[in-house]
A protein has these predicted regions:
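A glycine-rich dinucleotide-binding beta-alpha-beta segment and adjacent secondary-structure elements
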Residues: 216-303, 307
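Active-site and channel-lining beta-strand-loop segments
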Residues: 1, 127-140, 271-285
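Glycine-rich loop(s) and the adjacent beta-strand/alpha-helix scaffold that form part
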Residues: 9-11, 15-118, 317-323
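Active-site-proximal substrate-binding core of FAD-dependent oxidoreductases
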Residues: 107-124, 326-344
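An anion/pyrophosphate-binding glycine-rich loop and adjacent beta-alpha core
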Residues: 97, 106-212, 216
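Glycine-rich phosphate/pyrophosphate-binding beta-alpha loops
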Residues: 113-120, 124, 146-149, 259, ...
């Protein structure tokens, strides 16, 4: 692997920093524009960067994030998540991962991606039902966003509907308007219910306008309503507090698919380089530590590398970073780092 840098203080380096910062700042509001800025950043890197030699005598820690911003790697390892909104920093392009692989490292769980489909607020949304394109319910609607987003992308092709009846829709709109939510919570919710929605006077008509199967949608609603009335257990274990009978037409299907720009379905990669759990040393294909090479954060396999749970990513990065840093710190008593420009 090689390290390339823009000449310090150059006009290209200043422009690079400006464009990269703007891409980070606008990612959540204008992702396509941010992607265009990143292309300009990569152009500067390709045409003006120069190779540098860095000699580290204790060790090297790879901690550059995952690879959600690398379309080629996503297409290769996690193609079901190509359309998701990218969550993370621009540096999450797989550079650390690829550098480790070039040194003989082994990677694992590269197909594991966490996708987040939150359907609250409004807090009453989970009282509706989430169904697939056939009209079949497939999840407990009150679960954490990553627990809902995972099967939506992995098993349902990234397509699903949130079904409400007239009463629940009215309650949801009222909450979105007057419950004191942040604008970035209330506006997408209102847009989803008012713009990205299909309406049917009956269940059969709703199925027709959405392309769902009428018998499947009716069966899903009948089973759910029975559980909401207390006549039967909920098929997916939803709590009694989150159940509400849906029987007042017209009925509405809100598009919560990955392709809906009104309600982005974010995702980040979880896999990384295999490491020794005692010190963060990167392992080769034989399970042996590669001398002087360590990894941390999403560049490495960690606690949330199979299934993300809120907070684990930050905590795991802090833990794994300290672990690797401590291992490198005690590797030798003295250290020198030599950095010099390499001729082209």
């Amino acid at each position: 692997g090689e390290l390339w840098c823009l000449p310090e203080g150059s006009e290209q380096a200043k422009l690079h920093a400006k464009l990269a910062a703007r891409a980070e700042r606008l990612q959540n509001f204008a992702p396509r524009y941010s992607d265009a800025l990143r292309k300009r950043v990569r152009h500067l890197e390709r045409h003006f960067a120069r190779p540098r030699l860095v000699r580290a005598l204790r060790g090297v820690v790879l901690s550059t994030g995952g690879f959600i911003f690398n379309r080629e790697m996503i297409s290769q390892h996690a193609p079901k998540f190509r359309r998701n909104f990218k969550v993370g920093a621009s540096g999450g392009d797989g550079s650390g991962l690829r550098l480790g692989l070039s040194a003989g490292a082994m990677a694992d769980r590269l197909s594991r991606v966490s996708a987040w489909r939150f359907i609250n607020p409004p807090l009453c949304w989970p009282k509706g039902i989430v169904v697939n394109t056939l009209g079949q319910r497939f999840v407990n609607e009150e679960v954490y966003g990553a627990t809902l987003g995972q099967p939506l992308c992995e098993e349902q092709g990234g397509k699903a509907w949130l079904v409400l009846d007239a009463r629940l829709r009215k309650q949801s709109i009222k909450q979105a308007l007057f419950a004191g939510y942040w604008w970035f919570q209330s506006l997408p919710a209102l847009a989803l219910m008012l713009l990205r929605v299909r309406k049917g006077q009956s269940i059969e008509q709703l199925a027709q306008v959405t392309g769902m199967r009428g018998d499947e949608l009716r069966n899903a609603l009948q089973a759910y309503n029975a559980a909401a009335r207390g006549d039967a257990p909920d098929a997916f274990g939803k709590s009694a507090e989150s159940r509400q009978v849906l029987d007042q037409g017209p009925f509405y299907a809100c598009d919560i698919s990955v392709s809906n720009p009104v309600l982005p379905l974010g995702a980040l990669t979880l896999g990384g380089l295999k490491v020794d759990e005692d010190n963060g040393a990167v392992l080769d294909e034989h399970g042996q530590a590669i001398a002087g090479l360590y990894a941390a954060g999403r560049t490495a396999i960690g606690i949330p590398s199979h299934l993300y749970v809120s907070g684990l990513s930050l905590a795991d990065c802090v833990f794994s970073g300290r672990r690797a840093g401590q291992a490198v710190a005690v590797a030798t008593a003295h250290v020198e780092v030599e950095i010099c420009e390499q001729p082209l």
